[in-house]
Amino acid sequence: MLPLKSMTLNEQTDLLHVDAGALWADVIPYLDRYGRSIEVMQSDNNFTVGGSLSVNCHGWQYGRPPIASTVESFHLMTADGTVLRSSRTENKELFSLALGGYGLFGIILDADLHVVRNERLKMEQAVVPLDDAMALFDRKLHERGTPRMFFARLNIAPHRMFDDVLITNFYTEKGDIPKLKSPKLVGLRKLLFRGSVGSEFGKEVRWQAETKLAPVLAGTTFSRNQLLNESSGWFLDHSDATTDILHEYFLPPDMAVPFLKQARTIIRAHHEDLLNVTVREVQTDNDTFLNYADQPMIAFVMFFDQRRTVDADQDMGQMTRELIDVVLHSHGRYYLPYRLHASGDEFLAAYPQAEDFFHLKRKYDPDNLFENEFYLKYARP
């Protein structure tokens, strides 16, 4: 799909027609020339449009549902080779199934996406105790209004795990929009991040750098496109001995802090090397069948370093299931694209609509042309 990456912007309707193989790294500079920006995407630009739609990614654009909410229509090649246009009014069942459908209903060939204006944004940050974080954020909303972008990070130093939260908001600001440039401080950020692997001292140094040094070195004024134009390459593990493991959990806002306190106990008990927790919010997804945001959610993206051994993988699986159990008891859900550690019962508890989803899968693809490990584990065809 990667060669399929053409794109055209309709400036009158703010609709971007883009091939599924285009990377966000291709799309962002293109839109920047027209003063436009992607409405919803994940935090890294080295993903394809088609892949992002297939997992129904969400981002740190505040007050927004996942990316499916920005899709006007797309073309889908189905199991019999037919190419269908799908939207909320045309082949609408396939619209809800293919978005966030993990490739099980066909191949998304292209899409029409709603885009927004590029803007000048001012960063404001605060470090607060975990128990005060939700109240402070609500107070900030009342005082400053709705931010355009938002994320938070948790202190992951073992002796202070989750005790402190770095809240980062981006508000619109008058003035010229900064030109799109290459990301700053990539080498330093990589050194600090990878230097925190297996090191309590490294994690403490990184926290101090993120909370005190980064705003001074990187600045506080950005364009929206600059914030989106970041690759995951700088923080990835290239070792043969270890690998990166991602988790993501979605909690109702009133259960977010209680979940973290229980998660801290579980992670410490398993002695897993937690490198990062990013916090985002996501609004209700009314577009996809297998939706993870069935209500407004707080999302916790956890990033672990794991040794490439059978024992390490088994322990990671056990810890994951324990975390998922806490999520389920908190009326939350977990994100499906990552490792298949969840049990079948946990999967069905998190996604009670899954049996109907798989039934429709077999309706549209009776010969199971489109399969993946997720389908083979949980659908039991």
Language-model segments: residues:
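Noncatalytic alpha-helical scaffold of FAD-dependent oxidoreductases
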Residues: 1-381
